[in-house]
Swiss-Prot record:
<dbReference type="GO" id="GO:0003735">
    <property type="term" value="F:structural constituent of ribosome"/>
</dbReference>
<keyword id="KW-0689">Ribosomal protein</keyword>
<dbReference type="InterPro" id="IPR000630">
    <property type="entry name" value="Ribosomal_uS8"/>
</dbReference>
<dbReference type="InterPro" id="IPR035987">
    <property type="entry name" value="Ribosomal_uS8_sf"/>
</dbReference>
<comment type="similarity">
    <text>Belongs to the universal ribosomal protein uS8 family.</text>
</comment>
<protein>
    <recommendedName>
        <fullName>Small ribosomal subunit protein uS8B</fullName>
    </recommendedName>
</protein>
<dbReference type="Pfam" id="PF00410">
    <property type="entry name" value="Ribosomal_S8"/>
</dbReference>
<keyword id="KW-0687">Ribonucleoprotein</keyword>
<comment type="function">
    <text>Component of the ribosome, a large ribonucleoprotein complex responsible for the synthesis of proteins in the cell. The small ribosomal subunit (SSU) binds messenger RNAs (mRNAs) and translates the encoded message by selecting cognate aminoacyl-transfer RNA (tRNA) molecules. The large subunit (LSU) contains the ribosomal catalytic site termed the peptidyl transferase center (PTC), which catalyzes the formation of peptide bonds, thereby polymerizing the amino acids delivered by tRNAs into a polypeptide chain.</text>
</comment>
<dbReference type="InterPro" id="IPR047863">
    <property type="entry name" value="Ribosomal_uS8_CS"/>
</dbReference>
<keyword id="KW-0963">Cytoplasm</keyword>
<dbReference type="GO" id="GO:0006412">
    <property type="term" value="P:translation"/>
</dbReference>
<dbReference type="GO" id="GO:0022627">
    <property type="term" value="C:cytosolic small ribosomal subunit"/>
</dbReference>
<comment type="subunit">
    <text>Component of the small ribosomal subunit (SSU). Mature ribosomes consist of a small (40S) and a large (60S) subunit. The 40S subunit contains about 32 different proteins and 1 molecule of RNA (18S). The 60S subunit contains 45 different proteins and 3 molecules of RNA (25S, 5.8S and 5S).</text>
</comment>
Length: 130
């Protein structure tokens, strides 16, 4: 089976481990986008600590789960999102107002929609977490 998206596989592994009640999950291969996405999730308390293990191939990430995650996913293709359209995307993707985050990749880095609105930057949509 071919991998279509490394980020989608990583978030799917986290979702499945969270549903089965596991305390940690191993993600491989890793990428810079996955690490930045996990950093945003960790900043908002959806996951615990995570550790990057360099095996001189593609690398591994061990993520500690804390049971707060309901769902996380990837939006394909990565649609362009203007600052005015961020509200529309959050209404479509998230279950309620001020519950969860839409993750964007911008020229200022990977961040959630609230930080992007504060910094007044737009970009492409990566995924969501709640």
């Amino acid at each position: 089976m071919t991998r279509t998206s490394v980020l989608a596989d990583a978030l799917n592994a986290i979702n499945n481990a969270e549903k089965t009640g596991k305390r940690q999950v191993l993600i491989r291969p890793s990428s810079k986008v996955i690490i930045k996405f996990l950093t945003v999730m960790q900043k908002h308390g959806y996951i615990g600590e995570f550790e990057y293990i360099d095996d001189h191939r593609s690398g591994k990430i061990v993520v500690q789960l804390n049971g707060r995650l309901n769902k996380c996913g990837v939006i394909q293709p990565r649609f362009n999102v203007k600052i005015n359209d961020i509200e529309r995307w959050t209404d479509n993707l998230l279950p309620a107002r001020q519950f969860g985050y839409v993750i964007l990749t911008t020229s200022a880095g990977i961040m959630d929609h609230e930080e992007a609105r504060r910094k007044h930057v737009s970009g492409k949509i990566l995924g969501f977490v709640y």
